[in-house]
Amino acid sequence: MSANEIPDELWRKILEIGVKSSTFSYKDLCCISISSRRLFRLSCDDSLWDLLLVHDFPNHIVSASSSSESPTKFIYMTRFEREKERKLAAHRRALLRKESEISEWGRRIRELEARLSDEAERLQSSSLQFSDLLKVRQASVALNVWQPEVVRGRQKQMVEQNAVPVEGRLRALEMEMKLCKQQIMGLNRALREVKHRYDIAIKELESMKYHPLRDYKSIRNGDQGSNGKTKKLKTSINYSGDQVSNGKRRKLKTSIDCKFMNISHFSSCSSVTEKFYSYSPKIIHEYIPENLLVL
């Protein structure tokens, strides 16, 4: 029994059961509709699209006036476009939020790097002052040993000029150097953490912007460009050969490519058709009497 001999009621029942069991989606119905005019007419039935509308958009309420004026397939398409626009808008908002987060992490990194540079300069200045004071103290100790009278007079003059003694300044500079080192350690730790979060946000943004079809097309375009250069090089190398045999080879290759393109053109519909016809015998044996099947 061929597919053309099956009555419309049975085809309609097959499509209805497929939609109810979630075996057929709106994509499958669209692929089935382009296989023949008969299936196009059956797949546009309002009862099938009513089931899909309830299943895919359970929160959508269809008014009686709109359902009577326009077919259910048009209502489903309108609702699908609205849902698609809503998802695209939500995706754009998520991208903007992620980009704002990345810019905030970048600003935080620049701020920490500036503070780290200031602390490093402060530490260097304190260490230079500390080393100068150490040299002064060592020189004063040596002079006190070899020329005590001169040192006493010089120290008396320095004490009168400076209110803070050398030992106190050394301790203050030492504490300031320790504080600078602690600040640098904390800033380095915070900078590593912020950079780690910045890298994570960059990867998340790349994954959010990833589009398989667009990226695949860009890759294929690059491959085609390189393949074109390779083909040109091979053609220039083999041009000195027999031109007649090359023409025959090109014709044979063109015919093979055309056959391959015709086969690949129907490969997308063949999977849906195979699923459709593999699903239909179960319904046929269930709803058609055995005597008709024998015929």
Swiss-Prot record:
Q: Where is this region: Disordered?
A: 217-245
Q: Which residues form a coiled coil?
A: 82-129, 167-209
Q: In its UniProt record, which GO terms are filed under biological process?
A: protein ubiquitination
- Give residue ranges for domain F-box: 19-66
Q: Which pathway does the protein contribute to?
A: Protein modification; protein ubiquitination
Instruction: List GO terms (cellular component aspect).
Output: nucleus; plasma membrane
Q: Which InterPro entries match?
A: F-box-like_dom_sf (IPR036047)
Query: Signal sequence span per UniProt?
Result: none
Question: Which keywords does UniProt give here?
Answer: Coiled coil, Ubl conjugation pathway
Which residues lie in Polar residues bias regions? 235-245
Q: What does this protein do?
A: Component of SCF(ASK-cullin-F-box) E3 ubiquitin ligase complexes, which may mediate the ubiquitination and subsequent proteasomal degradation of target proteins.
Complex formation:
Part of a SCF (ASK-cullin-F-box) protein ligase complex. Interacts with SKP1A/ASK1 and SPK1B/ASK2.
Q: Per the record, what about its domains?
A: The F-box is necessary for the interaction with ASK proteins.
What is this protein's name? Answer: F-box protein SKIP24
Biological classification of the source = Eukaryota, Viridiplantae, Streptophyta, Embryophyta, Tracheophyta
